[in-house]
Curated annotation (Swiss-Prot):
This is CTP synthase. The lineage of its organism: Bacteria, Pseudomonadati, Campylobacterota, Epsilonproteobacteria, Campylobacterales. PANTHER family: CTP SYNTHASE, CTP SYNTHASE-RELATED. One of its GO terms (molecular function) is glutaminase activity. Pathway: Pyrimidine metabolism; CTP biosynthesis via de novo pathway; CTP from UDP: step 2/2. The active site is at C379, H514, E516. The gene is pyrG. Residues 290-541 form the Glutamine amidotransferase type-1 domain.
Length: 542
């Protein structure tokens, strides 16, 4: 039977529950344990697919095409494992399932209530996510005391006494504020948070204490006594130079000892040598490059979480610090690309939706192409390379994507009416289709061209597999004209254009897929690694 570790948060949000869960999972995995991960989101949205990146951060796409919380990305990057749609569910999904079952007569006339029906559905989903794993780590979004989280708290409380559950362990992540005027660390917020948990019926067995300052031994003992945990179960979580240093910090504090004791896991000795070596290269690299990151959601950098982490992964393997120079694409429209990208060693244009900042991205692409600067365009960043090339090389005045101009005389990017999904089924869509769930999502194969940059990046693989999240496609009508003018299609999937390159450019690649979704610290994505490697090599030649 599966054992469960539940991670909750107290005092306030954004304390790092996801990194905590991922770090514990990493140490357990490196100890030879089969670990599953689950993020529960108490919001009522069915999924984050239609939520603003500026409000929620990045939407992470799983291998099987689910639009999930960005913490699933943290789990994959830390544990070097691909998780599926069962690794994330929301209040919206729970209520939808219960209401649908009620409408179909599945409850045989019962009055549907939070207890037992909603809570029962939550428990069922947690157990399903745990199937096939030795341990399932469950992160509960939000903060203890939130109204939205109460049914989930009740569900994990009930699982303590479930005969089908072999063991449970509760981890509580909380804040230890430092009052500068008094020069003191304060434990009261944590004590009150633990008291709130106890009122619900949950007693945490471990406290992860987030703090800017180191916790003295006397303070740890006081915290342990007031929260009714053993002294070795108070784990200090200081601000780290890199999030990838957190598992190492936890290991130094012997975090696995109380977990192993409670869950009867035996002696655990995780092998973290390779991990530690990569972290040292992140913190103290030998080389440095400056990358111009052109985007539109710069008010919240979390909107590009997977991509910025993928650049860190690549840099670690090349012993290089990738300094990101953030460039708002709307500012390029005002000031020009040269003014904002002139000091950059390479240019990356990220994906996005909507026409805000599009012309600025096109100017950035032109700047990288004309000045022979290494360039990587992802999703919309690839689509706009076709638009830029059509306008400025082919002379197609007014060329555009129909996403931004339905009446363009040269629709370089168009809405494909039907496509084959992951199961091989034909999907139909139009511009009137609902926004939620109508994208091309998940992992698809891509056939690469021999001798191309992308074939070389993937070590000669003829067919690669990467994840997608987009609605529009490159229009094959203009393929011959583009290729005759020097822009070559180097990646295809069932007739769809997946990657393009430019003949007379040292390193220029546009990809329709999102390579960042498959990048991990120990196994960086090949196309992003090749991009950073080319940037470093060309910058060192100058």
């Amino acid at each position: 039977m599966t054992k469960y570790i539940f991670v909750t948060g107290g005092v306030l949000s954004s304390l790092g529950k996801g990194i905590t869960a991922a770090s514990i999972g990493t140490l357990l995995k490196h100890s030879g344990i089969q670990v599953g991960m689950l993020k529960i989101d108490p919001y009522i949205n069915v999924d984050p697919g239609t939520m603003s990146p500026l409000e929620h951060g990045e939407v992470f796409v799983t291998k099987d095409g689910a639009e999930t919380d960005l913490d699933i990305g943290n789990y994959e990057r830390f544990l070097d494992t691909s998780y599926l749609k069962s690794s994330n569910f929301t209040t919206g999904q729970v209520y939808s399932a219960v209401i649908e079952r009620e409408r179909a007569g599945g409850y045989l006339g019962q009055t549907i209530q939070v207890i037992p029906h909603i809570v029962g559905e939550i428990v069922k989903r947690i157990k399903e996510a745990g199937e096939g794993h030795d341990i399932l780590i469950v992160e509960l979004g939000g903060t203890v005391g939130d109204i939205e989280g109460l049914p989930f708290m009740e569900a994990i409380r009930q699982m303590k006494h479930d005969d089908e559950v072999e063991g449970t362990f509760f981890v509580h992540v909380t804040l230890i504020p430092f009052i500068k005027a008094a020069g003191e660390l304060k434990s009261k917020p944590t004590q009150h948070s633990v008291q709130e948990l106890r009122r619900i019926g949950i007693t945490p067995q471990m406290i992860i204490a987030r703090s800017e300052n180191a916790l003295p031994k006397t303070f740890k003992k006081k915290l342990a006594m007031s929260c009714d945990v053993s002294s070795d179960s108070v784990i200090e979580a200081l601000d780290a130079a890199s999030i990838y240093d957190v598992p190492i910090s936890f290991l130094r504090q012997n975090i696995l000892k109380p977990i192993s004791k409670e869950l009867s896991l035996g002696e655990l000795n995780p092998n973290m040598e390779k991990w530690d070596s990569l972290v040292k290269k992140i913190v103290q690299p030998q080389n440095r490059i400056v990358l111009g990151f052109v985007g539109k959601y710069l008010e919240l950098k979390e909107a590009y979480k997977s991509l910025t982490e993928a650049l860190i992964h690549a840099g670690a393997h090349l012993d290089t610090r990738v300094d990101i120079h953030w460039v708002d694409s709307e500012k390029i429209e005002e000031r020009g690309a040269e003014a904002l990208l002139g000091d950059c060693d390479s240019v990356l244009v990220a994906g996005g939706f909507g026409n805000r900042g599009v012309e600025g991205k096109i100017k950035a692409i032109e700047y990288a192409r004309v000045n022979k600067i290494p360039y990587l365009g992802i999703c919309l960043g690839m689509q706009l390379t076709l638009v830029e090339y059509a306008r400025n090389v082919l002379g197609y005045e007014g060329a555009n994507s129909i996403e931004f101009d339905e009446n363009t005389p040269y629709p370089m990017i168009y809405l494909i009416d039907n496509f084959l999904d992951q199961s091989g089924n034909t999907q139909l869509r139009t511009h009137k289709s609902p926004m939620g769930g109508t994208l091309r999502l998940g992992e698809y194969p891509c056939d690469t061209l021999e001798g191309s940059i992308i074939r070389k990046a993937y070590h000669g693989e003829k067919t690669i597999h990467e994840r997608h999240r987009h609605r529009y496609e490159a229009n094959p009508t203009y393929r011959k004209a583009l290729e005759d003018a020097g822009m070559i299609v180097t990646g295809e999937s069932n007739g769809l254009i997946e990657a393009v390159e430019i003949k007379d450019h040292p390193w220029f690649l546009g990809v329709q897929f999102h390579p960042e979704f498959t990048s991990r610290l120990q196994t960086p994505n090949p196309s992003i690694l090749a991009f950073v490697e080319a940037t470093l090599a060309i910058s060192q030649e100058e």
